[in-house]
C-alpha cells in the first residue's frame, strides 16, 4: 500500500470515531461505576420504562391507552410480559459490541441520569391501532 492509502485509512478511522462519539449520545460505563443519585435502577427502572412506553404509544395512536391505566395497578400478566421482554432484549444484547463496551439502558439510566426521551428509545415499536 502506498502512503496515501494508509493516510486515507487512518483518516477514515478517525472520522468514524468522531461520528460515533458525536452522534451516538450514549454513555459508556465501567463495571465498577457507581449508580447516579438521580438514576433509575432495578424495579424503579422497569416501572418507569413501562410507564414511558405506554405514554409514548398512547401519544402516537398506539393500542395502549395511558389514561385508562393511570392510577390503577396493571395486570400481573401484562407486567410479566413487559419484564420478560426487557430480559429477552438484555440477553439478546449481551453479545453485542455495544453492550460489551458498557452501553445500554442500565448504563444510560442507572449509572447515569437519562431523560424521558432517552428512556423511550428503549420502548418496543409502537403499533398503530386500527
UniProtKB/Swiss-Prot annotation:
A GO CC term attached to the entry: extracellular region
Primary subcellular site in the record, as a coarse category: secreted
Keywords noted in UniProt: Amidation, Carbohydrate metabolism, Cleavage on pair of basic residues, Disulfide bond, Gamma-carboxyglutamic acid, Glucose metabolism, Hormone, Hydroxylation, Secreted, Signal, Toxin
Organs and tissues of expression: Expressed by the venom gland.
Keyword Signal included in the entry's annotation: yes
Cross-referenced Pfam families: Insulin
Entry function: This venom insulin facilitates prey capture by rapidly inducing hypoglycemic shock. Intraperitoneal injection of this peptide into zebrafish lowers blood glucose with the same potency than human insulin. In vivo, when applied to water, this peptide reduces overall locomotor activity of zebrafish larvae, observed as a significant decrease in the percentage of time spent swimming and movement frequency.
Protein name (Swiss-Prot/TrEMBL): Con-Ins M1
Native source organism of the sequence: Conus marmoreus (Marble cone)
